[in-house]
């Protein structure tokens, strides 16, 4: 039987990716990022304060919040604010986004400022956390470029780019950038976060159906590296535009 993906893509093909800067008016950085039908609004907000544990240390902080609009999926879900608390998945994802972005920042160069990345999923079709990281990096870059332009900081605090992509084993084949039909029916699902120097920042991998082998893991990481190269090129092109 010939292997095929629901979308018709090849195994090593990303969905169409778009990065639209300055999507909203008020934030220091804002991006609408689209991975196929997954769309995430990422805004970067700068505040001249830091958490209590950093006061007086001359360091900045980068953090993130993540949420999904009630009808970003096939059926409506209540807003977490209406429930009175954030869910475990939400907390896990926003911590992941924050960790990923802190990995590309010299916090001493930022000074005692906090940059908060708000990542709001407008439409979900798989890979929302990886899209959020990829788009939030561009919003973060716009925010720090504005700080430099205004003379608020002297040294550029970004020490590299960060992006993320999903990979998985779908019907026995390693594939890149899973959409929802694949994500909901895969044997292995993995999220990979990397910097543009080829370093891995975070790997999140789970065997959903059956355990994966070392050779399959190597194949998944090779796919992720290929996709990451394309994503870094798209980020650079967006920031140059």
UniProtKB/Swiss-Prot annotation:
GO terms, molecular function: 3'-5'-RNA exonuclease activity; tRNA binding; tRNA nucleotidyltransferase activity
SUPFAM superfamilies found in the cross-reference section: Ribonuclease PH domain 2-like (SSF55666), Ribosomal protein S5 domain 2-like (SSF54211)
Annotated organism of origin: Xanthomonas euvesicatoria pv. vesicatoria (strain 85-10)
Enzyme class label: transferase
Protein name: Ribonuclease PH
Residues the record lists as binding phosphate: 89, 127-129
Record EC number: 2.7.7.56
Pfam families: RNase_PH, RNase_PH_C
Subunit description: Homohexameric ring arranged as a trimer of dimers.
Cross-referenced NCBIfam families: RNasePH
Family the UniProt entry places it in: Belongs to the RNase PH family.
GO biological process, one term: rRNA catabolic process
Function field: Phosphorolytic 3'-5' exoribonuclease that plays an important role in tRNA 3'-end maturation. Removes nucleotide residues following the 3'-CCA terminus of tRNAs; can also add nucleotides to the ends of RNA molecules by using nucleoside diphosphates as substrates, but this may not be physiologically important. Probably plays a role in initiation of 16S rRNA degradation (leading to ribosome degradation) during starvation.
Tree of life domain: Bacteria
Keywords: Nucleotidyltransferase, RNA-binding, rRNA processing, Transferase, tRNA processing, tRNA-binding
Catalytic reaction equation(s): tRNA(n+1) + phosphate = tRNA(n) + a ribonucleoside 5'-diphosphate
């Amino acid at each position: 039987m010939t292997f095929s993906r629901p979308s018709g893509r090849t195994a090593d093909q990303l969905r169409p990716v778009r990065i639209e800067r300055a999507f909203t008016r008020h934030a220091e950085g804002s991006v609408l990022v689209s991975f196929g039908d997954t769309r995430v609004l990422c805004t970067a907000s700068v505040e001249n304060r830091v958490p209590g544990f950093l006061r007086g240390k001359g360091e900045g902080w980068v953090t993130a919040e993540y949420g999904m609009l009630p009808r970003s999926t096939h059926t409506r879900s209540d807003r977490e604010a209406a429930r009175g608390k954030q869910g475990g998945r939400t907390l896990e994802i926003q911590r992941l986004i924050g960790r990923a972005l802190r990995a590309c920042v010299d916090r001493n160069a930022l000074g005692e400022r906090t940059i908060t990345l708000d990542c709001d999923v407008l439409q979900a079709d798989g890979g929302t956390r990886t899209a959020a990281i990829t788009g939030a990096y561009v919003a973060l870059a716009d925010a720090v470029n504005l700080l430099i332009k205004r003379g608020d900081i002297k040294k550029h605090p970004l020490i590299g780019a960060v992006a993320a992509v999903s990979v998985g084993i779908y019907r026995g084949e390693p594939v890149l950038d899973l959409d929802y039909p694949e994500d909901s029916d895969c044997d292995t699902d993995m999220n990979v976060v990397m910097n543009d120097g080829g370093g891995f920042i975070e790997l999140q991998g789970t065997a959903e159906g059956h355990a994966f082998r070392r050779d399959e893991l190597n194949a998944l990481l090779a796919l992720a590296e290929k996709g990451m190269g394309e994503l870094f090129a798209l980020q650079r092109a967006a920031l140059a535009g």
